[in-house]
Amino acid sequence: SAHHWHDVGQALREVKRVLKPGGVIIVMDVMSPGHPVRDVWLQTVEALRDTSHVRNYSSGEWLTLATEAGLVVNQLLTDRLPLEFSSWVTRMRTSEPLVEAIRLYQQSASAEVKAYFELQEDGSFTSDTILFEAHKAV
């Protein structure tokens, strides 16, 4: 849920402060693809679905945020997560006008965006995820 936090850097600094010696933090979240056009598309879809959305960060942004917070990333894994559209919007109780806006936005996406996110006719798509483990820098 880090993509809902207003100050991820501050949150990671607080994690570092309270982390026991030898302790680790594990973070998993939906991730920005890092490419500007794909990033804008994902952030827009996420914000339409859930008004509490702040930002999905790319792997490079996560590494920078962790390093600036005084953490050392031990391991970083990325993956792809298929999202079934109907259950995805239902989980957040997205209003019908916003569901329609998302569908229209999906339909207007470029061929490159549609291919990258594996957009389906029913609105389902695939998003990137990140999982990383970090410890305090010495």
Cite the ranges covered by each PLM segment:
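Conserved class I S-adenosyl-L-methionine
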Residues: 24-48
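Conserved Class I S-adenosyl-L-methionine
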Residues: 60-63, 67-138
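A short, basic/aromatic alpha-helical/loop segment that forms part
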Residues: 5, 56, 125-127
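A short SAM/SAH-binding and catalytic strip from SAM-dependent methyltransferases
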Residues: 1-8
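Short, glycine/charged-enriched secondary-structure capping and boundary segments
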Residues: 10-13, 40-43, 90
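Acceptor-substrate binding/catalytic loop of class I
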Residues: 46-61
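A short glycine-rich, Lys/Arg-flanked "PGG" loop and its adjoining helix->strand segment in the class I
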Residues: 9-24
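Histidine- and/or cysteine-centered catalytic micro-motif in compact active-site loops
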Residues: 1, 30-31, 79
